[in-house]
From Swiss-Prot:
Residues 582-775 are annotated as: Transactivation domain. One of its GO terms (biological process) is sarcomere organization. It comes from Mus musculus (Mouse). The gene is Six4. GO terms for cellular component: cytoplasm; nucleus. Mainly expressed in the skeletal muscle (isoform 1 and isoform 2 but not isoform 3), and weakly in the heart. Also found in the retina and the distal tube of kidney. Expressed in skeletal muscle, nasal epithelium, cochlea, parathyroid and salivary gland. Expressed in muscle satellite cells of normal and regenerating muscles. The modification Phosphoserine is found at residue 634. The keyword Phosphoprotein applies. This is Homeobox protein SIX4.
Length: 775
């Protein structure tokens, strides 16, 4: 029997404890290496755990194991090993690693790594830090963790960090930038494309900043006052600056080119919608003004002519009486009820009142009105030169094609005229009512009207009544009633009542042909109204040098009206009843013409007998120095001709009236040889012999106005002889632009304005012997 001694047992127990301690220590070291290696390896993966297991946890586990071993050993020898076990326990407790740096040191290292841009080292430093209550809530550490999370693309952790802690305002700009950039990056990944400014704005509205990194105050960006003033000045001058101007403005204001462009875009948009931005705008404090897009939508109602000094043409047309508001040519503002106007090449369809304004446009409808030129009545199709225009009729000594290029001075002398006529067939009276009130233009009472003298027709012929033209300042107003059988007179022009001239070789019409020219001799205007009723007018375009027309023979009684006018007024002489075998008496009484003090135009009135068909002979030209009453009929002058035409009239008694004939371009002259008996010379009666003096041309009339005179040879021996070879020479007015030819006789006028009183020519009775024969 052997028994171990107590000392041996104690020694063996001590050896066991020592061995257990060594094993536990080695296990603790291995565990520490494993944890440390795992922590070091955890830095390399792209998405490591944000807070790995700290090394102190392994030390605590080893400490627990050592305590258990020490407790077991102490049970064996509580007395002898008490001090040793206590020392070992203290040694194990001292083995836990303490915090190597203070919180300030950790924050300084984080800031240094952030500023240096070493985000990978910052991430490794953060993983190496132990969990400590001292580091909990450190703002520098949280900011560093947020920056590392953004760098590694762990956006949910970033949002969690930013929303869980209230940061100081000094850190708000950086953290706000991280917030928005993270949102933008997520959206770009989801959409697969870069975001635009609008997309980013919508994301900012969808994901507002948390209050932890935002104080809740919105900052409105505003340019400096100097920059805003420079932008405003350029905006006043030009709302659409060029790129060069934008670059220059950006250089002056210190802004970028994009900022300048956006400012102009926003300002124009605010000005387009002034009702939406009544408050002050972001970039300037001035209320919005009207933009250019709202221009052009102004009121189309008539405006006062006195207030419209920018050369704007105002027209207002009605369906019954057509008052025309006129001003100098410019932009056209038209107010139409049931009318149409063609201005500056733009056609406005019309049903009742087409207007030819200042020779710039032509409109056709129920009433054709050509201001300062020609008036065409109802149901017409005027086309005497189809290849060029739909209306080429000579009026007021100027072809319509010439009027198209006339200046505004030709339009200044508009007159106010009212005309009324009685249709003998239907016995219906057409007369214009009182002048329509012109809003803002002129009251009705300011238009003076002289008395109207109406001469009734004995055999049912038409009676044309003219009132006195009234001049209102430099603007004219024309009133034209919608009458189907009246000849209308506008400023010494001719008017055609129902006349149909379609653009074909032959045109026929069953209606009234009223050609009413104005003539002057001495110091007054004279005019002979004449009509052809229920007749036909045939226009047969020949070669460019001749036009033949035929007027059927019909006996009518023509009455006339005499009027005393204002400045440039009209005095209408009388015409006696005439037929093919009757006598024509057309005279100008001196008492009707003297003392009027009117400025004359250069023309005269002569009645010429006409046949059913006759040709037109080529005209001859007389220079202004040769224009005197003593010129013979057969005196031709070959010279280049001017670009003006004459106004002619044909009556129902087969005679033509010509006046205001100006020179015609030589290449445009049309000639037709007198192959058959066409016209005979006129012999005035010996009752009165009046010396014809040269007349004066008014300065407002065409300066280059001259007369084209044509002599008519003695074709038939039974015609009366012309006495004294006065200025009553046969006249042919012809223009290839107008294709409208009329024969007649006119008295020449000179251009000298210094001539004083002129004697008036009196036309004597014409004896018509027999009818003319057709060509």
């Amino acid at each position: 029997m052997s028994s171990s001694s107590p000392t041996g047992q104690i020694a063996s127990a001590a050896d066991i404890k020592q061995e257990n301690g060594m094993e536990s220590a080695s296990e603790g070291q291995e565990a520490h290496r494993e944890v440390a290696g795992g922590a070091a390896a955890g830095l390399s993966p792209p998405a490591p755990a944000p807070f790995p297991l700290e090394p102190g946890d392994a030390a605590a586990a080893s400490r627990v194991s050592r305590e258990e071993g020490a407790a077991a050993a102490g049970a064996a020898d509580q007395v002898q090993l008490h001090s040793e076990l206590l020392g070992r326990h203290q040694h194990a407790a001292a083995a836990q690693p303490p915090l190597a740096f203070s919180p300030d040191h950790v924050a300084c290292v984080c800031e240094a790594l952030q500023q240096g841009g070493n985000l990978d080292r910052l991430a490794r430093f953060l993983w190496s830090l132990p969990q400590s209550d001292l580091l909990r809530g450190n703002e520098s550490l949280l900011k560093a963790r947020a920056l590392v999370a953004f760098h590694q693309g762990i956006y949910p952790e970033l949002y969690s960090i930013l929303e869980s802690h209230s940061f100081e305002s000094a850190n708000h700009p950086l953290l706000q930038q991280l917030w928005y950039k993270a949102r933008y990056t997520e959206a770009e990944r989801a959409r697969g494309r870069p975001l635009g400014a609008v997309d980013k704005y919508r994301l900012r509205r969808k994901f507002p900043l948390p209050r932890t990194i935002w104080d809740g105050e919105e900052t409105v960006y505003c340019f400096k006052e100097k920059s805003r003033n420079a932008l405003k000045e350029l905006y006043k001058q030009n709302r659409y600056p060029s790129p060069a101007e934008k670059r220059h403005l950006a250089k002056i204001t210190g802004l970028s080119l994009t900022q300048v462009s956006n400012w102009f875009k926003n300002r124009r948009q605010r000005d387009r919608n002034p009702s939406e931005t009544q408050s002050k705008s972001e970039s300037d404090g001035n209320p919005s003004t009207e933009d250019e897009s709202s221009k052009g939508h102004e009121d189309l109602s008539p405006h006062p002519l006195s207030g419209a000094s920018d050369g704007v043409t105002n027209l207002s047309l009605s369906s019954h009486v057509e008052p025309v508001y006129m001003q100098q040519i410019g932009n056209a503002k038209i107010s139409l009820s049931s009318s149409g106007v063609l201005l500056n090449g733009s056609l406005v369809p019309a049903s009742t009142s087409p207007v030819f304004l200042n020779g710039n446009s032509f409109i056709q409808g129920h009433n054709g009105v050509i201001l300062n030129g020609l008036n065409v009545g109802n149901t017409q199709t005027v086309s005497l030169n189809p290849p060029k225009m739909s209306s080429n009729i000579v009026g007021n000594g100027i072809a319509m094609t010439d009027i198209l290029g006339s200046t505004s001075q030709d339009v200044k002398e508009f007159k106010v005229l009212q005309s009324s006529a009685v249709n003998s067939a239907a016995t219906t009276s057409y007369s214009p009512s009182a002048p329509v009130s012109f809003p803002g233009l002129i009251p009705c009472t300011e238009v003076k009207r002289e008395g109207i003298q109406t001469v009734a027709s004995q055999d049912g012929g038409s009676v044309v009544t003219f009132t006195t033209p009234v001049q209102i300042n430099q603007y004219g107003i024309v009133q034209i009633p919608n009458s189907g059988a009246n000849g209308q007179f506008l400023n010494g022009s001719i008017g055609f009542s129902p006349l149909q001239l379609p653009p074909v070789s032959v045109a026929a019409s069953q209606g009234n042909l009223s050609v009413t020219p104005s003539t002057s001799d001495g110091s007054t205007f004279t005019s002979e109204p004449a009509t052809v009723q229920h007749g036909k007018l045939f226009l047969s375009p020949l070669t460019p040098s001749a036009v033949v027309y035929t007027v059927p023979n019909s006996g009518q009684t023509v009455g006339a009206v005499k009027q005393e006018g204002l400045e440039r007024g009209l005095v209408f002489s009388q015409l006696m009843p005439v037929n093919h075998s009757a006598q024509v008496n057309a005279s100008l009484s001196s008492e009707n013409l003297s003392g009027s003090g009117l400025h004359p135009l250069t023309s005269s009135l002569v009645n010429v007998s006409a046949a059913h068909g006759f040709s037109l002979t080529p005209p001859t030209l007389l220079n202004p120095t040769e224009l005197n009453p003593d010129l013979a009929e057969s005196q031709p002058v070959s010279a280049p001709v001017a670009s003006k035409c004459t106004v002619s009239s044909v009556s129902n008694t087969n005679y033509a009236t010509l006046q205001n004939c100006s020179l015609i371009p030589g290449q445009d002259l049309l000639s037709g040889p007198m192959t058959q008996a066409a016209l005979g010379e006129i012999v005035p009666t010996a009752e009165e012999q009046v010396s014809h003096a040269s007349t004066a041309v008014h300065q407002d009339f065409v300066r280059e106005q001259r007369l084209v005179l044509q002599s008519v040879p003695n074709i038939k021996e039974n015609f009366l002889q012309n006495s004294e070879n006065k200025a009553t020479n046969n006249l042919m007015m012809l223009d290839s632009k107008s294709k409208y030819v009329l024969d007649g006789m006119v008295e020449a006028g000179c251009e000298d304005l210094g001539t004083d009183k002129k004697e008036l020519a009196k036309l004597q009775t014409v004896q018509l012997d027999e009818d003319m024969q057709d060509l």
